[in-house]
């Protein structure tokens, strides 16, 4: 785990760091443009067809060690990530653009926000997608909770390769989104992150079989926060992967928790 101060200090020791930020995460883009004023930056995905598909192209920015306000703002908005690369700003921009272009063959989908924390974690933790982030030796993403960055070492790949997301990868991505959301929610903020991850994975599994409304997602989330022990029972995964309705699962979840509680006090 690394603090923003430590990352910025490493720049003065010669570390070539860049940050990617999604302008579209800002309700008022002028807030971001003011923070990056005078900094060396490039619109990401320049010279790719996807540049025309989004209101504001993400920005690739070279950090200079004096950018704490910018980095802190991006961290708290979960709007991007930090990377280390020995390539020039223009070369790195082109390399990352090639990564996006390779995705044209990815089942017709475009993962233009591969640098957002949940998406980046999904890619970086997947062996099958280890070819991604070509040209970057390290990537830092905001931790689920707290004020530190988590570091991912990158293997060196010289040839672009297609990024293909499977249905299972989509579920993992949903779980990553939920982990970031739950970790800072009032119901989960004082609960160990290992339990938060379990809950997010459980909710993603439930939603993969039958969509959950926002109301029901909140209901399940708050119930799991109050009944953590149910997720460590051997029957839990069998229950949530059962192809029955979520209403039926809800009833059985109550029954399972009662059984777990009885066994605990027996």
Where are these regions (language model features)?
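A contiguous, surface-oriented mixed alpha/beta subdomain in the mid-to-C-terminal portion of proteins
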Residues: 2, 26-47, 55, 86-90, ...
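A broadly used, surface-exposed interaction patch
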Residues: 52-105
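Short, hydrophobic/proline-enriched secondary-structure or compact coil segments at domain edges
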Residues: 14-26, 81
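Surface-exposed ligand/attachment interfaces on beta-rich extracellular proteins
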Residues: 7
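Short low-complexity stretches enriched in small and charged residues
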Residues: 12-18, 33-40, 66-72
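Flexible, charged surface loops at secondary-structure boundaries
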Residues: 10-14, 53-54, 74-76, 133-134
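Surface-exposed beta-strand edges and flanking loops
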Residues: 21, 63, 84-85, 141-143
């Amino acid at each position: 785990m690394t603090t923003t101060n430590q990352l910025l200090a490493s720049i003065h020791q010669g570390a070539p760091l860049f940050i990617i930020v999604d302008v579209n995460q800002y309700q008022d883009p002028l807030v971001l443009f003011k923070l990056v004023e005078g900094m060396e930056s490039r619109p990401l995905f320049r010279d790719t067809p996807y540049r025309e598909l989004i209101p504001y192209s993400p920005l690739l920015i070279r950090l200079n060690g004096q950018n704490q306000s910018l980095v802190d703002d991006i961290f708290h908005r979960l709007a991007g990530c930090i990377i280390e690369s020995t390539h020039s700003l223009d070369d790195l921009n082109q390399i990352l653009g090639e990564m996006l272009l390779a995705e044209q063959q990815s089942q017709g989908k475009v993962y233009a926000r591969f640098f957002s924390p949940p998406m980046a974690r999904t890619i970086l933790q997947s062996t099958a997608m280890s070819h991604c982030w070509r040209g970057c030796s390290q990537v830092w993403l905001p931790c689920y909770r707290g004020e530190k960055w988590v570091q991912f070492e990158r293997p060196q790949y010289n040839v672009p390769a297609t990024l293909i997301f499977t249905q299972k990868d989509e579920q993992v991505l949903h779980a990553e989104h939920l982990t970031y959301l739950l970790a800072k929610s009032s119901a989960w903020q004082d609960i160990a992150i290992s339990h938060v991850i379990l809950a997010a994975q459980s909710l993603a599994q439930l939603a993969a079989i039958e969509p959950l409304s926002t109301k029901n997602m909140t209901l399940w989330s708050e119930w799991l926060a109050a009944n953590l022990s149910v997720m460590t029972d051997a029957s839990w995964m069998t229950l949530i992967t059962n192809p029955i309705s979520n209403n039926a699962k809800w009833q059985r979840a109550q029954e399972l928790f009662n059984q777990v509680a009885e066994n605990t006090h027996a």
